[in-house]
Amino acid sequence: MPVIESAIQRVRLTKKQHDRNEPQASAYRTAVKRFEKAAAAGEDNLAELYKIASSAIDRAHSKGLIKKNKASREKSRLAKYVK
């Protein structure tokens, strides 16, 4: 455990940030995995799942969980399966 007051505050802040970010990151990863699984299985509701995954990626980017280029790259890779 940290002894210095500023280090104690950082521990509290880091935990708070983690508790806020982790559910959003999990939702983003789940949406992408659900789409990839459906694409591998050849299901026909890919357009709908792509829309959900794309929205989750955009949300993760707007919350600062992933960078702009990663969001664009992920969406581009997923879009190849929709065609």
From Swiss-Prot:
Keyword annotations from UniProtKB, A to Z: Ribonucleoprotein, Ribosomal protein, RNA-binding, rRNA-binding
GO molecular function: small ribosomal subunit rRNA binding; structural constituent of ribosome
Disulfide bonds: none
InterPro entries: Ribosomal_bS20, Ribosomal_bS20_sf
GO biological process: translation
GO cellular component, as recorded: cytosol; small ribosomal subunit
One Pfam entry name: Ribosomal_S20p
Presence of the UniProt keyword Oxidoreductase in the record: no
The keyword Ribonucleoprotein is annotated on this UniProt entry: yes
Function: Binds directly to 16S ribosomal RNA.
NCBIfam families reported in the protein's UniProt record: S20 (TIGR00029)
Family: Belongs to the bacterial ribosomal protein bS20 family.
Name the record gives this protein: Small ribosomal subunit protein bS20
Gene that produces this protein: rpsT
